[in-house]
Each structure stands twice: as structure tokens, then as C-alpha cells.
A protein has these predicted regions:
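Beta-strand-turn-beta hairpins that frame and shape the catalytic cleft
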Residues: 79-93, 182, 189-203, 227-233, ...
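Conserved acidic residues
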Residues: 120-122, 230-232, 252
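N-terminal membrane-anchoring alpha-helices
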Residues: 2-86
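Conserved beta-sheet core of the metallophosphoesterase superfamily
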Residues: 239-318
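Binuclear metal-dependent hydrolase catalytic cores centered on His/Asp/Glu-rich metal-binding motifs
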Residues: 168-182, 194-236, 242-244, 307-310
């Protein structure tokens, strides 16, 4: 007989057992790693989700702050316009689309800012009120009265005043403006002498679709031959009035509002939407050249009339220096 440890093939058996035992241990380790892998993936998913939520919160907070800021603040935008005949420079302040908003009690902040700008003329682009928001316009009329103590004030009606006038039959609306010291131009001209310069202000009523129906074309034809002025400014509430019709006439400066700056202004793209032009409008805030070599300034306005908030679009008080 052979000793136990000298049995032929015994070492081989022991080696095989050891090998199998090592493999089993390795298999045990692999089984543990597989059990941990799903937990690791869930941690990654949870972390990604938390980062996404944090980014959404930051973006939402920034948007909300922007919206709130745009409801309580405005900026003075300065424009420079050159005139061929003006002998002395003058300053015009243009405000539009206030929609009954107040900046300070009784618009004291707005009035103080305009007073400090020392304008020679104050021009209104319409929509100082909002149709359907009650019949009391005391704050608007008070603002007009305060402005008339600073400089001569004239302007045009916007579509919201037109709705009050034509749909609600508020025939006294223009009289209320007049009593507050404002000259409302409804296809009419007003003239002012400013620093020895005669300034002609044309006020065109309605929208571009109304040009041939309610007297605007007849009015513009009637004043076209005039040359006895040093500067002519044309007012219209809707900016597309100018490229569609008004740039065929003689004036040096056009002023309009209505678009609220496109409501949302996208970085590197510009205004998002206007009622007349749809998405990505051409005329929704800023300075533009017209075919008659005039400058058109479209104000972003001072207020809002819809539930859609302004985003990246601070309300504007336009200040135009003409020399």
C-alpha cells in the first residue's frame, strides 16, 4: 500500500480542489459587484435629476426676477436724430402704451424723471389706457395734467382708446385729454415754435388697414406740399403704418409704439412677436431707416395689456435729441 500522500494522482486532486475553491471565491466577489452595480446607476440617475431640478430652479428664479423687474422699472432710451433745417437742437420725450400702469404714487417717479430730462416737447403714442379695465382714467388724466406743466403735450390715440371711443361710445374721451392739457391729433397737424424753430407734428389715426377709409390718406396728401417748417414729426400708434404707407410722405422723424417691444426679446435674435407682423417682427423696438430718409423710432412702451409677461424686455421712455 502507498501512504495517503503518496497515492498516485493525489496532488492533482488537491490542486484541482484548490483551483475550484479559488474560482468559487472569485465568483463570490463578482456576484457582490453585480449586486452593487444597480445601486451605483440609481445614484447617478438621482444626481442627474437633482442637477436638472436645480438648473430649472435657477432658470425659473431668474425669469421670475426678470418679469418682476420689468413690471416695476423702466429705462430711458436715448436716440440722436439729425435735421437738415433745424437751427437749434431740441429734445423730445416720447411715451406710449402705459396701459394705466403707475410708476410711483400718481406716477410721481415718471413725472420726476421726465421733468429732469427738460424736454421741449412731450409726445404721446397712444394706449395710455386699457380697454375693458373700468371707466376710471383718473391716474392717466392726472399724468397728462402734470406733463402739460413741463412742456407742450400732444399725441395720437391707440387702439385701446379707439375701442373706447368707437365701441363704447365714449365721445368725451378726447375732451378729457384736452381738459388735461393734451392736444390729440386725429389726422391733424399741430405746430410749435421751439427755440426759434417751427416744428410740425402730424398725427395719423387708426391702423394701416384704415389708411384709405377714414381720412388718413386725404390728410397726408393735404399737408405734403407744405415746406414752411423746420422739422416735421409724424406720429402713428402702429409702426407698420410707416413702411406700408407713411414713408411715401415728407417728414424727418416717425414715432410709434403698440408692439410692447415684442413682449419677449430673445438674445441675439430680438423681439419674438407682434400682433401685426407675427413671430420675429421687423418693427418692434429701436431705430429704423425709412425709404424717405426719415428715422423711425419704435418705443417698447411703458406697460402691458395682456397676460403674457415681458421677458428680457424692459419698458422704455424714449428721449430723442434732434440737432
Amino acid at each position: 500500500m502507498y501512504p495517503l500522500n503518496s497515492i498516485p494522482g493525489r496532488k492533482d486532486v488537491a490542486f484541482i480542489k484548490a483551483k475550484h475553491g479559488k474560482g468559487a471565491a472569485q465568483n463570490g466577489r463578482h456576484s457582490g459587484s453585480c449586486a452593487q452595480a444597480p445601486a451605483s446607476r440609481w445614484k447617478q440617475v438621482l444626481l442627474t435629476l437633482l442637477i436638472f431640478i436645480a438648473l430649472l430652479a435657477l432658470i425659473g428664479g431668474a425669469l421670475w426676477q426678470n418679469i418682476c423687474y420689468n413690471r416695476t422699472h423702466y429705462t430711458a432710451e436715448f436716440y440722436q436724430v439729425h435735421s437738415r433745417k433745424l437751427t437749434q437742437s431740441c429734445r423730445v420725450v416720447f411715451l406710449t402704451d402705459l396701459h394705466l400702469r403707475e410708476y410711483g404714487q400718481d406716477n410721481c417717479e415718471l413725472v420726476q424723471d421726465i421733468h429732469s430730462l427738460a424736454p421741449d416737447l412731450i409726445l404721446l403714442g397712444g394706449d395710455l389706457v386699457t380697454y375693458g379695465e373700468g371707466s376710471s382714467y383718473d391716474n392717466m388724466l392726472s399724468l397728462c395734467s402734470q406733463l402739460s406743466e413741463i412742456a407742450p403735450v400732444c399725441g395720437v390715440l391707440g387702439n385701446h382708446e379707439d375701442e373706447l371711443y368707437f365701441l363704447d361710445g365714449d365721445q368725451a374721451l378726447v375732451e378729457k385729454f384736452t381738459a388735461a392739457g393734451v392736444t390729440i391729433l386725429r389726422n391733424q397737424e399741430a405746430r410749435y415754435t421751439v427755440r426759434d424753430n417751427v416744428i410740425s407734428i402730424l398725427g395719423v389715426e387708426g391702423s394701416p388697414a384704415d389708411f384709405y377709409n377714414y381720412g388718413a390718406s386725404t390728410f397726408m396728401d393735404s399737408v405734403e406740399p407744405q415746406t414752411d417748417y423746420d422739422l416735421r414729426i409724424c406720429l402713428a400708434h402702429v409702426p407698420t403704418y410707416f413702411p406700408e404707407h407713411l414713408e411715401n410722405y415728407s417728414f424727418e422723424l416717425g414715432l410709434a409704439g403698440h408692439t410692447h417691444g415684442g413682449i419677449v426679446r430673445l438674445p441675439k435674435i430680438g423681439p419674438l412677436y407682434s400682433a401685426e407682423e407675427g413671430f420675429l417682427p421687423d418693427y418692434a423696438g429701436g431705430s429704423y431707416g425709412l425709404a424717405n430718409n426719415a428715422t423711425l423710432i419704435v418705443s417698447r412702451g411703458l406697460g402691458d395689456s395682456s397676460w403674457v409677461p415681458r421677458i428680457n424686455n424692459v419698458p422704455e421712455l424714449s428721449v430723442i435729441d434732434i440737432d
